Regions:
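Beta->alpha loop/short-helix hinge microenvironment recognizer with preference
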Residues: 1-272
Length: 272
């Protein structure tokens, strides 16, 4: 669609993200649910955008050093459908989507509500060094500490256009924790790889780990069987996507999307 596309990232704080070590399916499901509810609710607020938005979310669980670092990358068209369905409501500023402070506060509150619900319903399991969190008092104290800190939501500058969005999705959606190109050497039971230190002005550094520790970190990022790491919400949700996208294009005065059969034929043809 001929609109700006924004890149919004929801990140779990370390003490909460660590719960995924023993409860990956529950924590990642709550992460999707809380981020989606946050974006949809804040965008629908008449004081903000006042529209029904749609977006695609991709789960990543790693940091550059391969430690557990759960976060969601969301690609969001800059606008949405008016409540009466008669207008496209664009962002008031082409470079600004929604206030990150408001998003972060809402995200924290919604996530912790769903997290406590999961605990109360017995859907969270703790053992080993984390066994103590199975006690209501200890778990409640963890949530109280998490409620007092800032939860980070980044809204990155808009993509250059739909073509850049497609390039981003092609590169980013199927990425794994570390690519072969970052691994410098495997020798003498050790693995040396490149990583970017965001806390030190994004400097590229090298890290050497024992092979067992490298494998342990890599295995942290294998998702539960059948878990879907790419999901669509709002007017991009699967159940109504075709109709909603057709409405969006009509409201924007944009051409209809080419049929999939035509796209497949086009990809199979050679120029000249």
């Amino acid at each position: 669609m001929p609109v700006p596309y924004f890149h919004v990232v929801f990140t779990l704080p370390q003490q909460i993200g660590g719960l995924a070590l023993q409860n990956a399916r529950e924590i990642y499901t709550i992460l999707f649910r809380a981020a989606a509810e946050t974006l949809l609710t804040i965008a629908a607020d008449p004081k903000r955008l006042g529209a029904a938005v749609g977006f695609l979310a991709v789960l990543h669980t790693w940091g550059q050093n391969l430690h557990l670092h759960p976060h969601l990358h969301c690609v969001v068209p800059g606008g949405g459908i008016s409540p009466d369905g008669d207008r496209w409501v664009g962002c008031r500023k082409q470079s600004f989507f929604l206030p990150v402070q408001v998003l972060g506060s809402r995200f924290r509150n919604v996530f912790l509500i769903y997290l406590k619900e999961a605990f109360d319903q017995g859907r969270l399991q703790f053992h080993g060094e984390m066994a103590g969190l199975g006690r209501p008092a200890a778990f409640g104290a963890l949530c109280s500490r998490a409620r007092r800190i800032k939860w980070v939501v980044h809204a990155k500058p808009p993509f250059g256009g739909p073509e850049q969005v497609l390039k981003y999705l092609a590169r980013y959606t199927h990425r794994v924790a570390i690519s072969n190109s970052r691994i410098l050497s495997i020798a003498d039971g050790k693995v040396t790889f490149l990583w970017k230190d965001y806390a030190d002005d994004n400097k590229t550094k090298t890290m050497t780990l024992d092979a067992v520790e490298f494998i342990r970190r890599f295995l942290l990022h294998i998702l539960p069987a059948g878990f879907v790491r790419i999901r669509q919400f709002g007017f991009l949700a699967n159940r109504a996507r075709r109709e909603k996208l057709a409405l969006c294009r009509a409201l924007l005065g944009a051409p209809s999307a080419a049929p999939r059969s035509a796209l497949r034929r086009g990809r199979g043809q050679k120029n000249g």
